[in-house]
Amino acid sequence: MARPRHQPGGLCLLLLLLCQFMEDRSAQAGNCWLRQAKNGRCQVLYKTELSKEECCSTGRLSTSWTEEDVNDNTLFKWMIFNGGAPNCIPCKETCENVDCGPGKKCRMNKKNKPRCVCAPDCSNITWKGPVCGLDGKTYRNECALLKARCKEQPELQVQYQGKCKKTCRDVFCPGSSTCVVDQTNNAYCVTCNRICPEPTSSEQYLCGNDGVTYPSACHLRKATCLLGRSIGLAYEGKCIKAKSCDDIQCTGGKKCLWDFKVGRGRCSLCGELCPESKSEEPVCASDNATYASECAMKEAACSSGVLLEVKHSGSCNSISEDTEDEEEDEDQDYSFPISSILEW
């Protein structure tokens, strides 16, 4: 009886399939990472079992890849104890085909590695002078503000042209916005709501720091914009003829502080912990005492139950920064933080 012969073609086909399987397996054996750290290791695991081509197809500049096919325990040790995965291969070695997004460009750094840096298009900017940003800081020009927005403040915008001011004098707000001065005597441009709906409940009434009852928060905002100086909220409900803080009920964990200058009380948030920062600027308060910071002044006010406000920055022995603004800044009773204007 004749033995069956092995077909050489079938054996070759089997070997080809085995090689293809091994090739596919090796192609899927790598790990994809979102960045390469300064120590040269891969960090922030994106996905396992990806080929280099698949990993690098994301187009991210910082994406990197490791070839090692390791278990979960090894990956955990790399990420937690070793500062990342070794043998890290960056997807991008040059700036070719790198898309950094709007306002950024790819440039080779001193170590000859591609990096996305802020490079806003400033060619269409006509005003070359300083501008005041929405963060209350002065920038030497609008291009410098755009760079700051690119780096760390995506919501940063130009409020008005020129340096940030302590008064609304000479502040020209764009569009329909109006200049308002906050508690720290910084000028901001805000949009006034000219139409307020009629209140539907008596619980909407608010007592302003000017002793006037407002039908709603919208009406208080509107009055603030028309005045050009923040009025502020004394307490919720209609204003009453209080003889002391004992007559005023504060809500939301606030404490009543008495303003002896006008004979009225207002509810203030106390219990704030002052940061131990040497960068805080001292302030001269309405009691003619110098405090290490505005926070320290508020802490003293909460402790005594007497309202204190900032007269000017710096020591009480120093001269106020803007003597020309004394006339406009004399009525501190109309002040409260600008954030309150924007949040309501």
Swiss-Prot record:
Q: Please list where the region (Disordered) is annotated.
A: 316-344
Source organism of this protein record: Bos taurus
Q: What is its main location?
A: secreted
Task: State the function annotated in the UniProt record.
Answer: Multifunctional regulatory protein whose primary function is to antagonize members of the transforming growth factor beta (TGF-beta) superfamily including activin, myostatin, GDF11 or bone morphogenetic proteins (BMPs). Mechanistically, binds to these ligands in the extracellular space, blocking their type II receptor-binding site to inhibit downstream signaling. Plays an essential role in muscle fiber formation and growth both by preventing the repressive effects of myostatin and through SMAD3/AKT/mTOR signaling independently of myostatin.
Record-linked InterPro entries: Fol_N, Follistatin/Osteonectin_EGF, Kazal_dom, Kazal_dom_sf, Prot_Inhib_GrowthFact_Antg, TB_dom, TB_dom_sf
Q: What is this protein called?
A: Follistatin
Q: Where in the cell is it found?
A: Secreted; Nucleus, Nucleolus
Acidic residues bias (residue ranges): 321-333
What biological process terms from GO does the record include?
cell differentiation; negative regulation of activin receptor signaling pathway; regulation of BMP signaling pathway
Query: How does the annotation summarize its subunit structure?
Result: Interacts with GDF11. Interacts with activin A/INHBA. Interacts with myostatin/MSTN.
Domain named Follistatin-like is located at 94-117, 167-190, 244-268
Classification via SMART domains = FOLN, KAZAL
Leader sequence range is 1-29
* Occurrences of domain Kazal-like (ranges): 112-166, 186-241, 261-318
Q: Output the Pfam families linked to this UniProt entry.
A: FOLN, FST_N, Kazal_2
> Got a GO cellular component term for this one?
nucleolus
Q: Does the keyword Protein biosynthesis apply?
A: no
Q: Which residues form the TB domain?
A: 30-103
**Positions glycosylated per UniProt:** 124, 288
